[in-house]
Amino acid sequence: MIRALEAVIISTDNAAKLAEFYREKVGLKQTEEMEIGDKGEKGFDFDINGTGLYILDHSDIKGKNSHGARVMFNLEVDDIEKEFERLKKEDVKVVQETYHVEEYGLIATFEDPDGNYFQFVQVRAN
């Protein structure tokens, strides 16, 4: 039986740079920095209410993701308009401005420096 989503992993050729983006611009709290293997590769852990977001160096990854929408993750926020404006001020690339999905809520889509997409969501009150 599957109990939960434990973590999401983003592999990159520059984990330090990508971790800085998620820490400094997106505002996630970094909980750990680690060295992986014997090649000096780095890893960074961000805890999002019990689910890990790991950003890891990977020797097989080179350059930007050419299909950023293939896999996305959503970060739930309390005030999507406020958070949207905050990221715009941080010069985070906007893929899709805030829009409404009936029976779900509001969504805004952004792109990180590696070309991966992530979304802010404000779900409707239950």
Task: Identify the role of each PLM range.
Residues 1-3, 90-126:
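Vicinal oxygen chelate
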